[in-house]
From Swiss-Prot:
Organism of origin: Cytophaga hutchinsonii (strain ATCC 33406 / DSM 1761 / CIP 103989 / NBRC 15051 / NCIMB 9469 / D465)
Family: Belongs to the TRAFAC class TrmE-Era-EngA-EngB-Septin-like GTPase superfamily. TrmE GTPase family.
Role this protein plays: Exhibits a very high intrinsic GTPase hydrolysis rate. Involved in the addition of a carboxymethylaminomethyl (cmnm) group at the wobble position (U34) of certain tRNAs, forming tRNA-cmnm(5)s(2)U34.
Residues the entry annotates as binding GTP: 234-239, 253-259, 278-281
Entry keyword Nucleotide-binding: yes
Cofactor(s) for this UniProt protein: K(+)
GO molecular function: GTP binding; GTPase activity; metal ion binding
Pfam families in alphabetical order: MMR_HSR1 (PF01926), MnmE_helical (PF12631), TrmE_N (PF10396)
A GO cellular component entry from the record: cytosol
Subunit record text: Homodimer. Heterotetramer of two MnmE and two MnmG subunits.
Bound cofactor: record note: Binds 1 potassium ion per subunit.
GO BP field: tRNA methylation; tRNA wobble uridine modification
Record-listed Mg(2+) binding positions: 238, 259
Gene name tied to this protein: mnmE
Protein name per its UniProtKB record: tRNA modification GTPase MnmE
Amino acid sequence: MSTTTVTNHTDTIVALASPQGIGAIGVIRLSGPQAFDITSSVFPSKNIAAVPTHTVHVGNIEDEGRILDEVVVTVFKGPKSFTKEDVVEISCHGSTFIVKELLQLLLRKGARHAKPGEFTMRAFLNGRFDLAQAEAVADLISSDSHASHQVALQQMRGGFSDEIRKLREQLIHFASMVELELDFSEEDVEFADRTQLRKLIHEIKRVIDRLIHSFSLGNVIKNGVPTVIIGKPNAGKSTLLNTLLNEEKAIVSEIAGTTRDFIEDELNVEGITFRFIDTAGLREATDAIEAMGVKRTREKMTQASLVIYLFDVKSTSERELIRDLEELKALKAPFLVVGNKIDKREDAIITTFRNIDGIIYISAKQNIGIEELKQNLLEIIQYESFKQNDTLVTNMRHYESLRETRKALDEVLTGMDSQVPGDLLAQDIRQSLFHLGEITGDISTDDLLDNIFSKFCIGK
């Protein structure tokens, strides 16, 4: 593993592992060579170093004879711990005063405040898991839906890493053969069969292309789908949002232009989080405030991953709808066209809009067609590929490394077509191995590790 220790890992770190604030319990975690001695110095009822691993002990925390709290101490002896070091977790009462006093006491006894993500960094540096798995720990902690939880869990257990590792192993074999040729350059010996190498690279590219393509779904599973509801004033946008959310989030009024700014909330559909933005209506504004809302609506449209265009079937003509659809087609984001208020004009729909395909008809007020709309939301983000248990890329860093790997592999193919010397071919293969190694941490730098783990919460 090409990495340098970014912090002194011979010391013992401590941090609050439970959320800040008052709670039933607070959990303080220590990791490092002095974790047992430091704990024993404030927990006199047990010699922590002498107890078996994975055991739990009840007793008092004492500071020079003064009892601070009655606690539960859990002992994990390295390497059978999260960090593969000696680890102690102290569960105390969740008073902010007790937690603060206990942390200060442990610091005085020789522990050091942990940096954000330092426990997980130590686990990575000690070989507990690779870098992609370490990043999945943070994703698991921040997961807020069934889908994001499932993807993070699969990655933390090594599913994604296994795919990358297999690709590297296949390439390493051919790289070694090409490198060996350089030692026999004067004899014109070819150890790496070029036909087999070309076949392998095409196979690897197919896997990488699938992983790159999966990022569009993986990213929205991890971060949610920014979804904008647009349409003319009084088309029923706020009513639709309220119906989807089953609560009154937006002001509903018969007065056109009531929604002057943005109302944001989240809807979970089969584990996928859609971050809905109900916008001001698209029309000529009658005052300065409303004009600002319309302008920002158009800005939100360009930033959205999904657009729901809602129109009133009662007051919209086919010509108007076709004109609006032309504007929607200019957007990069996929969109759904939804006709609202079918309860008021159901019989005339077929005649009026018979030449326009793909319209989803609903009544937001009567809750008609809402389930069909939800299924269309899932279909448009290609949700089926997630349900098939395919590996998904959710991390932008991994996505960029995969793209760079693909570029390097294209260079290898170009080099073989041009019959470049073996040393240049080997260089391009090494470059592809480098970018794959960036994902798992087989190739890493201090700056990269600092950047990744600094985004973790303290105590993890």
